[in-house]
Each structure stands twice: as C-alpha cells, then as structure tokens.
Amino acid sequence: MSLLTQTINHIGPLDDQAATAARRRQDMLTKPAGSLGRLEELSIRIAGITGRERPRLTKPAVIVMAADHGVARQGVSAFPAEVTPQMVLNFLRGGAAINVLARHVGAQVIVVDIGVAADLPSHPELVSRKLAYGTADFSQEPAMSRDLAQQAIEVGITCANEAIDSGVDLLATGEMGIANTTAASAVVAAITGRPVAEVTGRGTGIDDASLARKIAVIERALVLHQPNPRDGLDVLAKVGGLEIGGLAGVILGAAARRVPVVIDGFISGAAALIAATLAPAAVNYMIAGHRSVERGHAAVFDRLDLKPLLDLDMRLGEGTGAVLAMSLCQAACKVLDEMATFAEAGVSEKKEA
C-alpha cells in the first residue's frame, strides 16, 4: 500500500466529544457567551481536530515548498525563473517576509526544495527532496507524470510527518515558484469548473497583455489535457506543480495526524483543492488563514466552504498570511485553556430570564 493511500485511510472525522467539551467550557468562561466571536468557534474547531478539550499549540511551523514551472517560458510572470533559487537562498538566510513574520509569531520555517530548476548549495536548514528540475511546460505537454505527481504528494506527507514527529503541533503551508499562480489557476479552474478568466489574476504584477496571455495559455492547456476534476492526481499531473503537490501532501499528512493546518494563499488553496478531491475529510483539518487578493482565492474557499481568518489585501505567498493567522489559532486556544470559569473566579453568571 502506498504512503498516499495509507495516509488517506488514516484521515477520520473530527472528535465530536472533544469539540462538545470545548464548547461547554467556552460557555462557562468569565464572559458573555459568544462574545469572543470567531475565536470561540476556532478554539472549538481545534479541539475537534486535536481530540483535546483544551488544546495547547506551542510549536508552530510553516513548510515552504519550492519548485519551478516549465510554463514560465510562456511569459506568464513578471519575474524570470532564476528568482526561485535566489529566493530559496533568501529564505535560508532569514531575509524574506516569511522569515520575519515567522520569527514574530515564533514559528519554525522549514524550506523544502521539491523541484527547483537549479542545484542549490547544501545548507543545514534546507530539506532537499528534489524530484525534478521543475515541471514540463503544460501548455505543450503534461506538467508531470501521474507517478511523479504522487511522489510530490508523498514528499509533502513525509515532511509533515517529520515535523510532527519533532513536536510540531500546528502547521502552515507556504511556497515559492515563479509562474506558480499560472499552475494554481489551472488547477482551480479544472476542479471548480469556473471560467479561467474568473480565477486568474496578475500574480507577481503582470501587465494587461501578459494577463491575457496567461489566461489564453491556461485555457489552451485545459482543452489540450482535459484534466478530470474528480481526480486530484490527474489535475496535478496535467497542469499542476511539484510544490502544489507537496503542499497537498502536507495537508493530508497533517489531517492524518490530527494536527491543524493553516492554509495560506492562492497556491496553497489550489493544493487544498487537490487534497480535498483525494480525501474530502481532510477539509475538516484545514484552517483558512487569509483571503488573498489573487482573484481565484475566493473560488477556492467557496468550494471548500471555509471562511478565512484574515483579509489584509496580501498576495505574496510564502506562507505569510498563514503564519499571521497561526497567532490567532494560538490565541483562541489560550483563551479556552487559561481563562477562568465563573465558578473558579467567583463571578456571578448571567441571570436566567
């Protein structure tokens, strides 16, 4: 049995008993019931995910998957492909936005080379799991084989398992890869059935002509390959990316281990859609970190029926929105765990009518 199949088979429902106990405790805390709004619901959700009435999230980490895309040769990005390895080195030096924000919230940054189209120097903080030097140009041929797509997902599962085995109890998804919004738009259009123009944005800031070219490239690719929207592996293989597959694996791995996983932006959203086609129950373990201004992100949340915690007009990726949302997950759990109940504090409860 493959690692992917084993992992999917281990994804079960939320723990209703833990969630019910958490809700009961929320109602006993020294505040009007519901007065902390979505923080209360978030803590109850995390209780159901972890199976603990009073979950404590003390070791967060963001897994940043990096890979290149053959479709970049079609002029769909404002930046050249060599930016991918350059940014990976920036991550390793601690100089990127994800590093700054992760330090702010106390999260570990795990950088994974799953498909960068360059040989990166060895570094103690680099997880080298390169499967290929980027994908093929999916405007001409499938992005990768079905076998390679499964390998990408299994790399992500392994990375999630390794992080959880080291004590990580809250995961977030992040990525780097020039032209990966093109692949993400293709994945989202294929799975949701939305028109390509409706789920395709400017990515790194392309002009009108480049946006029109990007849309046309994706439309032609979907006609050429006819990805099956009910088969996440087929969609990933035909129009996806190695880092998208890796992140789908991170999500599945977290779900199988009952660890909450905070979904970042548009590319992570595409990975979440792939994970959901493979294991619908995995959606229960996803927390939507933020709403990206990248146009297709709303379609992702509509399909998954998730409501993002933050809406800050961000569109960087890397996991930046997700790590900010991690602090809300931790805050929600701290309120549930550390606040006194009415009985403990000697505070009178609300009078019954």
Curated annotation (Swiss-Prot):
GO terms for molecular function: nicotinate-nucleotide-dimethylbenzimidazole phosphoribosyltransferase activity. Transmembrane segments: none annotated. Keywords: Cobalamin biosynthesis, Glycosyltransferase, Transferase. Its EC number is 2.4.2.21. It holds the Pfam family DBI_PRT. It comes from the Bacteria. It catalyses: 5,6-dimethylbenzimidazole + nicotinate beta-D-ribonucleotide = alpha-ribazole 5'-phosphate + nicotinate + H(+). The active site is at E318 (proton acceptor). Disulfide bonds: none annotated. Pathway: Nucleoside biosynthesis; alpha-ribazole biosynthesis; alpha-ribazole from 5,6-dimethylbenzimidazole: step 1/2. InterPro entries: Nict_dMeBzImd_PRibTrfase, Nict_dMeBzImd_PRibTrfase_bact, Nict_dMeBzImd_PRibTrfase_N, Nict_dMeBzImd_PRibTrfase_sf. One of its GO terms (biological process) is cobalamin biosynthetic process. Catalyzes the synthesis of alpha-ribazole-5'-phosphate from nicotinate mononucleotide (NAMN) and 5,6-dimethylbenzimidazole (DMB). Belongs to the CobT family. This is Nicotinate-nucleotide--dimethylbenzimidazole phosphoribosyltransferase. It comes from Chloroflexus aggregans (strain MD-66 / DSM 9485). The lineage of its organism: Bacteria, Bacillati, Chloroflexota, Chloroflexia, Chloroflexales. The gene is cobT.
